[in-house]
Regions:
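Aromatic-rich, lipid-facing transmembrane alpha helices and their immediate juxtamembrane interface loops
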Residues: 1-196
Length: 196
């Protein structure tokens, strides 16, 4: 009986540590989305309210995603859980884009589906990597931080240097699509190579 109570206490402590990561997970996810949202909401549309609304929605979405991530990592082997998170985040994100925002292939054929899927996958995958305590992921975390800094600087320079109009619009749309695709590839390749 004492063994059972000790086991339950240990499980409770471990579970508590997991849930203490939730605020960091949400914060990193919101920051991951922030540059892309800034580009679309503010630099293209000039709509600060949309940026704020997106950040609030993303925080709520990430809270739910954290629960799903936690469950997947308890049920599946680590790499399988990670890949399941990537796929589910991309698919769920496309669901948000299609049914809540109106960026479906039939409603907005010009919307970049692959870029949107990568954006939503990164929204979950980047914080998943950041909150992971595995020391083998430290180099990947540094690469993500450097990439984020370079990407943000490039976006700000583009906004400052390019004239308003079509060039600036195209720059922001394509840097979001390509930027989040590259970030997703960096995350998936780095995680699968380093995590055990």
């Amino acid at each position: 009986r004492a063994y059972g109570i000790a086991t339950l206490r240990a499980m409770g402590v471990k579970s508590m540590r997991v849930w203490l990561r939730l605020p960091l997970f949400v914060l990193v996810g919101v920051l991951t989305a922030a540059v892309g949202e800034l580009q679309y909401s503010v630099f293209i549309r000039g709509d600060w309210a949309n940026l704020l609304g997106s950040m609030v929605f993303n925080a709520v979405y990430l809270t739910g995603a954290f629960v799903v991530v936690w469950a997947l990592f308890r049920l599946l082997p680590r790499r399988a859980a990670f890949l399941a998170c990537v796929i589910l985040a991309a698919v769920a994100g496309l669901g948000v884009e299609w049914f809540l925002i109106g960026n479906s292939p039939w409603g907005n054929p010009d919307a970049g589906q692959l870029g949107m899927a990568a954006y939503w996958a990164c929204l979950v995958v980047v914080p998943l990597i950041v909150v992971d305590g595995d020391a083998r992921l430290r180099p990947l975390k540094r690469r993500i931080a450097v990439y984020a800094a370079v990407y943000t600087l490039a976006v700000l320079l583009g906004q400052w240097l390019l004239p308003a109009g079509d060039w600036r619009f195209a720059f922001h749309i394509w840097t979001v699509v390509i930027g989040y695709l590259v970030l997703l590839v960096l995350c998936v390749a780095g995680y699968l190579r380093n995590a055990r």
